[in-house]
Amino acid sequence: LCASIAARVPNTSIAFGIDGATGTESDRISDSRFCSQCNAPLEYDYVQYGQLGAYHCPSCGWGRPTLLRRVTGVELGCDGYGFDLAFGPEANAPAVHIATRYNGLYMVYNVAAAFFAAHELGVDAAHLQPTLDAYVPAGGRMGRWDIAGRTVEANLAKNPVGFDRQIQSIK
């Protein structure tokens, strides 16, 4: 878990993630099922996929840190996800709405990571959506083609969690 790495290094870290259950079906594959502090089984309030979600250790109390940058209001539509990026832990923190034409909950995390990092570097939030709209995946990833009247999408899965996410996106 990233939080356990952040706790071991002197660098400043900013915890971010989806703040709340999304209602999407989570997989049962997890890279991290045990507490990095005491090795007891972790408990989750909700799981997005893999090890991502709200976790805590009932044995030692270690858990997901407070999210300093939050993704809220995640909604899946026919053409991708819409969500809000909140630039603080407070309910009334400044936020911007983002829409991505790519499906897969992992894209919400990818977009959030890139945009929160850009924000930390001083990029104005007004530039976020136009930048995403101009994005073209490399190497055929997430490519879409019309073949015989149907839309075909290609994607890449490099590990069991990624493969499970692709299967879930088909459902």
Regions of interest found by a model, annotated:
Residues 6-95:
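Extended acidic/charged loop-beta regions that coordinate divalent cations
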Residues 68-70, 99, 165-169:
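Glycine-rich, charged/polar anion/phosphate-binding loops
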Residues 62, 117-157:
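Gly/charged, well-structured mid-domain segments that form the phosphate/adenylate-handling core
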Residues 1-4:
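Short, polar loop motifs at secondary-structure junctions
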Residues 90-100, 145-150:
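Glycine/charged-rich beta-loop-alpha catalytic/anionic-binding loops adjacent to active sites
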Residues 54-57, 99-133:
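A conserved, hydrophobic alpha-helical segment in the catalytic core
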Residues 90, 105, 158-159:
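Short, glycine-/Ser/Thr-/acidic-enriched flexible segments
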Residues 26-33, 39, 138, 156-171:
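Active-site beta-alpha connecting loops in nucleotide-dependent enzymes
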